Amino acid sequence: MRKSAIAVVMAAGLIAGVAPAEAATAPTRPTAAQKLQLQYLVEEEKLARDVYAYLAANVTSQKFSNITKSEQTHMDNISALLKKYNFFNPTLTRAPGVFRDAELQKLYNDLIAQGSVNLAAAMQVGVAIEELDIADLKKIMVTPAPADVKLAYDLLLKGSYNHLAAFSR
């Protein structure tokens, strides 16, 4: 009986996309550090969305409009995790281009100025944002996380690579 229970647990972990060793060590709730990371990530996704929305309105490229929608989806996914775990969402009452994190606020202002020069500069801003997202995600993905948080990280990373490719063409 005990062996079959272990087999069921291992199978459930494999179905969920988690290796048996990971299933045993993955936390069921985000740590305090992961809470802060999720709050930062939702603001970082907001930065991307807000910059791309501004550039879509001021630079002639459909890429910015399309990727703005994708960034909103990323924000929605992280926002859902924040809500699920009853964590504060720093983006809920913020207007476009307004951030709680002072470094992100400065970065937004700088990127808008850089991207407003011409289409080539705007595309470089897109590359810079996606490279930043990828670097930040890779840093935080080394720590075990709950399955839903890990899945969100994986989807954000995949999306960032897709956006990077679009801006690099």
Regions of interest found by a model, annotated:
Residues 1-7:
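Bacterial N-terminal signal peptides that target proteins for export
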